[in-house]
From Swiss-Prot:
Species whose genome carries this gene: Pseudomonas putida (strain W619)
Name assigned to this protein: Threonine--tRNA ligase
Recorded GO MF terms: ATP binding; metal ion binding; threonine-tRNA ligase activity; tRNA binding
E.C. number: 6.1.1.3
Lineage: Bacteria, Pseudomonadati, Pseudomonadota, Gammaproteobacteria, Pseudomonadales
Residue ranges of every copy of the TGS domain listed in the record: 1-61
Amino acid sequence: MPTITLPDGSQRAFDHAVSVADVAASIGAGLAKATVAGKVDGKLVDACELITHDATLQIITPKDEEGLEIIRHSCAHLVGHAVKQLYPTAKMVIGPVIDEGFYYDIAYERSFTPEDLAAIEKRMQQLIEKDYDVIKKMTPRAEVIDVFKARGEDYKLRLVEDMPDEQAMGLYYHEEYVDMCRGPHVPNTRFLKAFKLTKLSGAYWRGDAKNEQLQRVYGTAWADKKQLAAYIQRIEEAEKRDHRKIGKQLDLFHLQEEAPGMVFWHANGWTVYQVLEQYMRQVQRENGYSEIKTPQVVDRILWERSGHWSNYAENMFTTSSESRDYAVKPMNCPCHVQVFNQGLKSYRDLPLRLAEFGACHRNEPSGALHGIMRVRGFVQDDAHIFCTEDQVKKEAADFIKLTLDVYKDFGFTDVAMKLSTRPAKRVGSEELWDRAEGALADALNESGLEWEYQPGEGAFYGPKIEFTLRDCLGRNWQCGTLQYDPNLPERLDASYIAEDNARKRPVMLHRAILGSFERFIGMLIEHYAGVFPAWLAPTQAVIMNITDKQADFALQVEKSLNGSGFRAKSDLRNEKIGFKIREHTLLKVPYLLVIGDREVETQTVAVRTREGADLGSMPVAQFVELLTHAVSRRGRQESE
């Protein structure tokens, strides 16, 4: 006779075992209809799950985060149902939930086309309209093997082999289609109406390029059609903002097959890049960093000592010369320790902050490359702080403040901070971990802002702080990091003379604010849709004449603005002024200066913005003041 305790503290007693769905029905017909699953004593279970003992129960509906995840997982199974009806010889692999959606990996004799994707989606809609129940059966292992052998589902059999300790497994039946899963899943296909298949891509069995290639069908699913429509609108906006499209439109960069994952920066894009670098150089100089430069290619011996050769070799580009093996550096840390090790260091020299705009190369899989967001060659705003354990808290607190200030300059004010703590497999004493985590937590608390723990997500040698930016589309981008590391100084024999004249190891704090310049510029392009703030715009002002008579004055204005440190160009083409204005508006130039006879006579410029605002005529000196103010704000709003 189980007694069920609900989230509000109320209780319901039953004289027999009762399912989650039964409890929901006892509360109300509306809740019963909306029940996706339940959480019994904190564990997610199917709506059909019987409760035989006193328990706490939360009814899960599509409004709950868990409910939405269950809907997405069930949609992946529905993909399987549709695919097997349309392509009976296809073999289903895995279909997990991902951020805002799901995918299913499939083995088939030919590549799916966009027409196939549309056909699969249409069949899924037809299956949903049948409004059938999804049936779960806990099935003995031997019977599961028989089921998948009979259906020729080779990959499912391999997955069963991966779970030797599982003596019974959950099989979920969508009519004639059967799939294996721990669940839970929706009780009926009526919950799956708000879905859409989004794209096709390639994948490899177990994610290993050495294995056979599979096809991946991606989709998204939501609680209702309104949420789905909002998501589609957001994705369409993201496609308009795709940095690859805008990069071409604004002539910022290009990529080509002969150099996969390497960026060809054009003059406009390189201007943005240089503004970022000069800005970060100034910020670091003002905050006590010394800029250094270390080699690109380093002997294998150093990478062996640092541990990278044994743990990271497959991601490193290597070469040989005169019977010596070398690697192109994938990161800067070991080289920075070499700089620290030159000359005896005293505790009075600490903290020592070494910064480098370090060019790194990593042998990323070609399938993982994406525009300038995921590349093989990139530059980081990388720095390492060598300090004593007692200095960690202050250095971390100063870095947090600096990082948040930098993000504000780029227009990012919604920043999530997370502290990743000790993983199960780790080195170092518990006392060391306590002190390290405590110092970083205290530094985060000093910021006065909200932050959260990520238990078990730290590196094996130390905790770290991560900074995640939310852009104008609500997407999250993990950028900044502060990693506590007592391990590399030990491996590379870094030391300093302490106050008691003993030789001690420094703590090394790895830190980056932007991360990779390439990725950060890609983010900025999409965040601003190419409409860069004046300080970042490749061209800040363009001067246009109406007729040839104003050409000389236009050139004078261009020279004056460039002489004042701005990026200005003149457009003296024999084109109508309306054509010129439209063209430079599409190129997203912040300020458009028009010069006609009246402007020449009064020595003024008629100022328009790319948004179409007419600021009227003004002397060049007044425009310089206006542009100076716009540039000085960087990406901040007027109110900041």
